[in-house]
Amino acid sequence: VTVRGRRVELDAVFVLHHRPWRDTSRMLDVFTREHGRLMLFARGVRGPRSRSASLLQPFVPLLASWTGSGETAQLTQVEAAPGGSVVGLPAGALLSGWYLNELLLKLVLRADPQPAVFDLYARTLDRLRDGQAVAAVLRGFERDLLVQLGFGLELGREAQGGAPLQADRYYHFHPSLGFVATSDDAEAAYAGRSLLALAEDDLQEDAVLEDARRLMRTALDDALEGRELRTRSVAR
């Protein structure tokens, strides 16, 4: 990536959302590796002679250049990232991809560089392209996103005293506190073995996946602070 005054050259970029702007242009909500989320104006890309329209689609890894900053930045160049897919996601993974995008749009602040989150997103798209189990892929993304954005999801220890979680015990989760041991018949308790499996990305068993789904929903609800996710139904 090169930064020259108010010009940025060839940063890694994904388009999260786009909408028409005037007759032949688009407004792009993009996630860049080194500059975070930005709004870019892409002039003329909807015109009949545009060569970049097919590239400026969600889920396609790109290299982009732009001038300006804030709400006035303008796209000046775009090309496919070396070695990246130029066809987005397969049809069966599209809804999951939109769910990832909505999480980023809701939780990642504008102009806040998050290179680790960018890399996590890119890896997750690759896993979806490879046809890996969708539920396990989404739970892993949710877990790592919350950790990277500082929401304090500590899967390995109890909130009070920091004792390691035990596989044969059960726990309640309090978003502002963490995990608290409880009895095995407590309502909405999480199995310790499920929490440890989630921490190790071992998401093959149905019981583990169900506990992981419930936990991630609770943790994300807290992070979203009441904002709704339109795509949440695909994350079950």
Model-derived regions, located:
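Non-catalytic alpha-helical scaffolds and adjoining flexible linkers that form interface surfaces
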Residues: 1-236
